Amino acid sequence: MKKIAFHIQKGGVGKTTLSGNIASYLSKTKKVILVDCDIQQASSSTWFLNHEILKLDIKDFLLKKMDVDQVVRQIQKNFYILPCVPSGTFRRDVQHELQDFPYLIDDFCLELEKLGFEFAIFDLSPSFELWERRIILAMCEVITPLTPEFLSLEGINIFKEEFESLLKSYRKKVKHEKIICNMLNKSFKRHNLHLRQFKTFGYDLYEVGQDAKIAESQLYKKSIFDYYPESRSVLELSRLGDALCL
């Protein structure tokens, strides 16, 4: 099972939108689960109706030791989600558990693999505490979304330093080869300037433009591939999804 996390310590860059759309794309040919690891439940809210009550979520598996198949919810064929319900004590409780059981996330991923999942896509919060660090250490690859803004230049450098330090400390290998320039508008001079800078970083770069259809698709609880397959964003998102299958 391939384990992919979308992460950077900055909000508003489109981690949730990108992770959900990539998970949806991969589910056309693979069995995929989207794991909502953000206590703001962004992914869970994106894929479920506002009035729908999610009684069980990721903490019921991690903390209450419920079977993972009782917690996952199916969105469509081959596409599942492990939701997260807001809780004021979730981060504290799960980080306490991780101190006692440092391989909790690794064991969790093994349980997902037993259910036949071929991809697990993790949507992380813009933090870098024990919760996020343990998830990253269990991944095959981390993908960093950026927006074409000045602060993104500093953000990717900070993340790279902390990411490399984390891997060195635990002697782990996790790929970090792909970045996404998200919400790009090439009619803006500053966006083109930052895009050129992103191209010098040495990563595989994916360019996803500003797209009102992506925002609209969330209103209908659909991916851009199902809501508006003619979208300008589909080609580059598909290219990223195909690269993850290699």
Swiss-Prot record:
Pfam families: AAA_31 (PF13614). Gene3D superfamilies: P-loop containing nucleotide triphosphate hydrolases. Keywords: Plasmid. The keyword rRNA-binding does not apply. Coiled coil: none annotated. CDD domains: ParAB_family. The keyword Ribonucleoprotein does not apply. PANTHER family: COBYRINIC ACID AC-DIAMIDE SYNTHASE (PTHR13696:SF99), P-LOOP CONTAINING NUCLEOSIDE TRIPHOSPHATE HYDROLASE (PTHR13696). This is Uncharacterized protein BBD21. The lineage of its organism: Bacteria, Pseudomonadati, Spirochaetota, Spirochaetia, Spirochaetales.
